[in-house]
Regions:
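ATP-dependent helicase/translocase motor core
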Residues: 1-245
Length: 245
């Protein structure tokens, strides 16, 4: 509302409802519909100027610094009527209060044979996506947290990989490059550059994150008409940016 102070409380409530309420849609269908809203949302009327059906910019893509970015640790979402009372993703990244990234972090120990796969399973559970639970007629997550989701991130030790809400376990990838070069001027917190730093400095930098959402995220049909969400990999993004320049 900082750049659109004309929005009334009623209109803000309506926009909030549009992001959360996607009746009779699968998570992927809801995600695609909400992504369209992130590019072009509308309300009935500008009550100050009288303009009908004005466009509302939920995110300012042209001026990333004008948006509000928050990272919330241990973000709790109550899930009444589900197998567990709540879900608590390790980190959720918000832009203007809209959750775009959900991160699950695991610790390597003797009890976890494959912590990265365990993180993937946890991300599935958070969005009620585990087939065995669905087939049993049970609910264990809150899909609405993922209506606006751009990226899922799983991390353990020095490893860190990203995917989308349709990515299988084998289709999570590391972001292996920091670009532009100006972002390399930082001090790794542990004195060594791990995959976490590469993803944070590269993909999760505010202007890059919003640029990837706006220019490098697509929904497409593949084998047997199955629809998926795809986000570019680091080499594709860098090549595209260099062509534009």
């Amino acid at each position: 509302t900082r750049t659109q102070p004309w929005l009334s409380d009623r209109q803000l409530d309506d926009l909030h409802a549009q992001l959360l309420r996607q009746p009779n849609r699968t998570l992927l269908e809801a995600n695609e519909a909400v992504q369209a809203l992130l590019f072009k949302a509308q309300v009935d009327r500008n009550e100050i100027t009288g303009e009908a059906d004005p466009v509302v910019a939920l995110i300012d893509f042209a001026h990333p610094q004008r948006n509000r970015f928050h990272a919330i640790n241990q973000f709790r979402v109550d899930t009444p009527g589900c197998v567990k009372r709540c879900i608590i993703p390790d980190i959720v990244l918000f832009v203007n209060g809209i959750p775009l990234v959900v991160v699950e972090a695991k610790v390597a120990d003797a009890t976890a044979a494959n912590p990265m796969h365990a993180a993937f399973e946890q991300l599935l559970r958070y969005r009620n996506g585990r087939p065995e639970t669905k087939n049993a007629g049970l609910r264990e997550g809150e899909p609405r947290l993922f209506h606006s989701n751009l990226l899922l991130v799983r991390t353990c030790g020095e490893r860190c990989e990203f995917g989308t809400i349709t990515s299988g376990h084998e289709h999570f990838y590391a972001w292996k490059d920091i670009w532009p070069e100006s972002r390399r001027q930082y001090t790794p917190p542990l004195g060594v550059e791990r995959q976490q730093e590469l993803l944070i400095q590269g993909l999760l930098a505010p202007d890059t994150l919003l640029d990837v959402l706006r220019t490098s995220t697509v929904f497409m049909d593949i084998d047997a008409g199955r629809r998926i969400k795809v986000v570019c990999r680091y080499q594709q993004y860098r090549a595209a940016r260099k062509i534009v320049e």
